[in-house]
């Protein structure tokens, strides 16, 4: 939702302040295929295996999202 940095519906998430829906200090992310322990996964790490003719999708190192079609900057 607007203004939220993370999903405050899960108070057990150590990356997200459930009261404010903001990332905790030092956290880069709270969830996503390219987020691990509140930090972005390094650039080039496979986050989704190839299917058919499509290449593996890889983390960018700058986002918690896993981009489509293997583009990682």
From Swiss-Prot:
- A Pfam short name: Disintegrin
The cellular component terms of Gene Ontology attached to this UniProt record, alphabetical and capped at eight, are: extracellular region
Q: Chief location of this protein?
A: secreted
Residues of the Disintegrin domain: 1-73
Among its keywords, does the record have Transit peptide? no
Q: Using the UniProt annotation, give all residue ranges assigned to the region (Disordered).
A: 51-73
Q: How is expression of this protein distributed across tissues?
A: Expressed by the venom gland.
Q: List the disulfide bonds.
A: 6-21, 8-16, 15-38, 29-35, 34-59, 47-66
Q: Which InterPro entries match?
A: Disintegrin_CS, Disintegrin_dom, Disintegrin_dom_sf
Keyword annotations from UniProtKB, A to Z: Cell adhesion impairing toxin, Disulfide bond, Hemostasis impairing toxin, Platelet aggregation inhibiting toxin, Secreted, Toxin
Q: Which GO terms describe its molecular function?
A: toxin activity
The coiled-coil segments of this chain are: none
Pinpoint motif Cell attachment site by residue range: 51-53
Compartments annotated for it: namely:
Secreted
| Highest taxon listed in the record's lineage | Eukaryota
Is Secreted tagged as a keyword? yes
How is the quaternary structure described?
Monomer (disintegrin).
Of which family is this protein a member? Belongs to the venom metalloproteinase (M12B) family. P-II subfamily. P-IIa sub-subfamily.
PANTHER family assigned: ADAM A DISINTEGRIN AND METALLOPROTEASE DOMAIN, ADAM METALLOPROTEASE
Role played? Inhibits fibrinogen interaction with platelets. Acts by binding to alpha-IIb/beta-3 (ITGA2B/ITGB3) on the platelet surface and inhibits aggregation induced by ADP, thrombin, platelet-activating factor and collagen.
- Reproduce the miscellaneous comment text: The disintegrin belongs to the medium disintegrin subfamily.
Name-wise, this protein is Disintegrin lachesin
């Amino acid at each position: 939702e607007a203004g939220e940095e993370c999903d405050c519906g899960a108070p057990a998430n150590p990356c997200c302040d459930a009261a404010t829906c903001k990332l905790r200090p030092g956290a880069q992310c709270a969830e996503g295929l390219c987020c691990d322990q509140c930090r972005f996964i390094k650039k080039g790490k496979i986050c989704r295996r190839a299917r058919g003719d499509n290449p593996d999708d890889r983390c960018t190192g700058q986002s918690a999202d896993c981009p489509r079609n293997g583009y990682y900057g």
